[in-house]
């Protein structure tokens, strides 16, 4: 726990700021922010499902209703494996929500601390461009879950006669969720419907980020709250890069949100000093609070 946070804080302080060339549909990293062109209610619905992954007491309360979603299945205990919840949602389809860091679990913390860029896992490597690298710890978190996720998503798609699959995550769960979003789009019939990722760290190198833009750029919605430092790590100095088009809520926990085009937009989150605590990271995203320590259990949709 201490090791993971210490390394992450140090690397956050050393993060570099610069623009980057991006794929055609992703706009330019020097473009000015624009109004968020998405359905904001879907962000709120996704946020409450992200929060519920931190709620161990309701982990197997199948049938639990959260907004328009019903809990179908759960795996992982947040210690050996990150918790993943599957829901049936009117707006999101089969929703896959992945837990963020459990700071009381050394294994969970180590997922955040294993910073080495590595080749993609053999299950999906052939679908990605040569030279793709992803962070070792995040990929380990995903490969602990991937087979269970695929088996149960296929099962519930058939049972519920549902073609849409949405991936949701916060923090470490967002990093794992980005890998899951791309993998589902590449290997699962009907692909990805939407992805909602809150407090997303950098996951892969520029080749990975460009491929994400090409394959799921129009389906990916990721959000930064205020001065949250987590999205600034791992640093670009280690070869990591974000995909395009994030939503920045600034000031934190407010309703002032804009979409920042391109990769590593020069007008966005990197223009303000980071606050190296978890207040903004575990903040209010589209009227719903997400966080292992600050969020409510059972999760509550809206209210802020």
Curated annotation (Swiss-Prot):
Localization terms from the record: Secreted; Secreted, Cell wall
E.C. no: 3.1.1.-
CDD domains, A to Z: Lipase_3
Active site, per annotation: 171, 228, 281
Encoding gene (name): MDL2
Transmembrane segments: none
Keywords: Cell wall, Disulfide bond, Glycoprotein, Hydrolase, Lipid degradation, Lipid metabolism, Metal-binding, Secreted, Signal, Virulence
Catalysed conversion reaction: a monoacylglycerol + H2O = glycerol + a fatty acid + H(+); a diacylglycerol + H2O = a monoacylglycerol + a fatty acid + H(+)
Organism of origin: Malassezia globosa (strain ATCC MYA-4612 / CBS 7966)
Family, per entry: Belongs to the AB hydrolase superfamily. Lipase family. Class 3 subfamily.
Protein's name according to its UniProt entry: Secreted mono- and diacylglycerol lipase MDL2
Temperature optimum or stability note: Optimum temperature is 15 degrees Celsius.
Role this protein plays: Secreted lipase involved in Dandruff and seborrheic dermatitis (D/SD) probably via lipase-mediated breakdown of sebaceous lipids and release of irritating free fatty acids. Shows activity against monoglyceride and diglyceride substrates, but not triglyceride substrates and does not exhibit regio-selective production of diacylglycerols. Hydrolyzes both 1,2- and 1,3-diacylglycerols. Also hydrolyzes distearin, dilinolein and dipalmitolein.
